[in-house]
């Protein structure tokens, strides 16, 4: 098919149709300083070697997570990914695979999706899982919308300690629906404020554990109260490794479990792509309203076991107004990486990994708490916790960087204008005793 560019007349007609005077008006939300007035002055006729050197020089200005003591978390975690994972997902059968519309030629892809779903369901203590979402935030947002459809109610209550990005994603989706989201204060460690918001109009309650500050929550009581009012409970997690040690959401009464799977099989990747996990209880109402795709196991006409897309109520398959989401193909490769890594770990390996993460975090918390002026905020945590500093956390992080330490996420970056002296810190199996010692010494130096 030939490429036929739009004429000036075509462009004017399109701009007139949407009521915009010029193409520049389409980009008014982009700051002037970030816009290009013309072409970048790039060197021409460079060899491949010269281009590689130039790009390497540019990338060297970044501080790689592997090149410094790294304690940044808040939704994205540095874990070791076995070489086997990257090797297998680069096989052409997986790397170039498309949505398995034709099961007879897509059994490998469909089986891995089925295995992924099985692992997610087991991990979360749920009965059914879909074939993944874009990331944890979109999984959370879709869960809120699903709960509204199932209960036919329009009020969602979210704990303020749910990751702010997850809250914003949910609010964005709710903005174009009848759903209203009530967000409680993030400061209290208990769930009393959430419970107080639950009434007969509540569709769902959304709670994260471990939450954005690293605090662990027992969902049993809030689940009981929510269910008495006819509301669903959505449990959120940003650190999937925690489920190797912490009680699964399904075992604490949650109806839907959603979260980020990046910490298993997927690198930091400059913030994406990641893999959203989505699971729920075995209820026909839930399954029919679950977003995305579900791979199922069946028997063909010859009695052979096979795999197919059992449910796929996304907008590419059915009418847009009847679709439950618009999840697409590219999420599949990350879910494959997750499945391979989880298979390599096994149940015992995941528990060992989770325990190592927790022990490392405990050692770090002890070391930092010993620094004069530093107070540990958390009573409970998995591999992430928050400390209270005697000075602005944002400034402390910048000072730590000059010591070569990437020392966490200032809470004020997630809650502008609040928690200015609070620093959220994560520790994983990749952190060594030497890293912890360097961090503690550097922190003492900048305070």
UniProtKB/Swiss-Prot annotation:
It comes from the Bacteria. It is an enzyme of class 1 (oxidoreductase). GO terms for biological process: glycine decarboxylation via glycine cleavage system; nucleoside metabolic process. Keywords: Oxidoreductase. Its EC number is 1.4.4.2. GO terms for molecular function: glycine dehydrogenase (decarboxylating) activity. InterPro entries: GcvPA, GDC-P_N, GDC_P, PyrdxlP-dep_Trfase, PyrdxlP-dep_Trfase_major, PyrdxlP-dep_Trfase_small. It catalyses: N(6)-[(R)-lipoyl]-L-lysyl-[glycine-cleavage complex H protein] + glycine + H(+) = N(6)-[(R)-S(8)-aminomethyldihydrolipoyl]-L-lysyl-[glycine-cleavage complex H protein] + CO2. Transmembrane segments: none annotated. Pfam families: GDC-P. The glycine cleavage system is composed of four proteins: P, T, L and H. In this organism, the P 'protein' is a heterodimer of two subunits. The glycine cleavage system catalyzes the degradation of glycine. The P protein binds the alpha-amino group of glycine through its pyridoxal phosphate cofactor; CO(2) is released and the remaining methylamine moiety is then transferred to the lipoamide cofactor of the H protein. Belongs to the GcvP family. N-terminal subunit subfamily. PANTHER family: GLYCINE CLEAVAGE SYSTEM P-PROTEIN, GLYCINE DEHYDROGENASE (DECARBOXYLATING). This is Probable glycine dehydrogenase (decarboxylating) subunit 1. It comes from Maricaulis maris (strain MCS10).
